[in-house]
Curated annotation (Swiss-Prot):
UniProt cross-references to InterPro entries, sorted A to Z: Ribosomal_Su5_D2-typ_SF, Ribosomal_uS5, Ribosomal_uS5_bac-type, Ribosomal_uS5_C, Ribosomal_uS5_N, Ribosomal_uS5_N_CS, Ribsml_uS5_D2-typ_fold_subgr
GO function terms (MF aspect): rRNA binding; structural constituent of ribosome
Gene assigned in the entry: rpsE
Protein name: Small ribosomal subunit protein uS5
PROSITE patterns found in the cross-reference section: RIBOSOMAL_S5 (PS00585), S5_DSRBD (PS50881)
């Protein structure tokens, strides 16, 4: 029998934030750590997860586990960019994602860059609007990627040919 870890391709794991959080109890404060992690295969699959534990490595491990359970598939054009422009919104965080021509690279800030690189997107333009909270920005980016549609899917939904959609 093949172990799941061996069968799966090597995953890209990026820690976006680590925070120390406190629970106030009768005797004082109980501290623990919260980690936000992005996991992807570099070929169009990406997921995010949060983990919390009393030790940082344990919080990261839990976050990675959680991220692997919340993977989504991103439609890519030529395996390098997204099919169309989209605005991802989560809370007060907004992320504008635009397809880019070959050789442009990933033009993105911290949390957005982590998600896009883990997904394997090589050419894209982004602008982070609204809140700069890393958690909201990561979720807004994921929401934008989740909302992407391929031309074939749109054509099928509308009962038209791809040429009719593109022109």
């Amino acid at each position: 029998m093949i172990d799941k870890e061996q069968a799966a391709p090597e995953m890209i794991e990026k820690v976006v934030t680590i925070r120390r959080v406190a629970k106030v109890v009768k005797g004082g404060r109980r501290f623990s750590f919260s980690a936000l992690v992005v996991v992807g295969d570099g070929e169009g699959k990406v997921g995010t997860g949060k983990g919390k534990a009393t030790e940082v490595p344990e919080a990261i491990r839990k976050a990675i586990e959680n991220a692997k359970k919340n993977m989504l598939s991103v439609p890519l054009i030529d395996g390098r960019t997204i099919p169309h422009e989209i605005l991802g919104i989560f809370g007060a965080g907004q992320v504008l994602l635009k397809p880019a021509s070959e050789g442009t690279g990933v033009i993105a800030g911290g949390p957005v860059r982590a998600v896009l690189e883990a997904a394997g997107i090589k050419d894209i333009l982004t602008k982070s609007l609204g809140s700069d909270n890393a958690t909201n920005i990561v979720h807004a980016t994921m929401e934008g990627l989740r909302s992407l549609k391929r031309v074939e899917d749109v054509a099928r939904q509308r009962g038209k040919t791809i040429d009719e959609i593109m022109n």
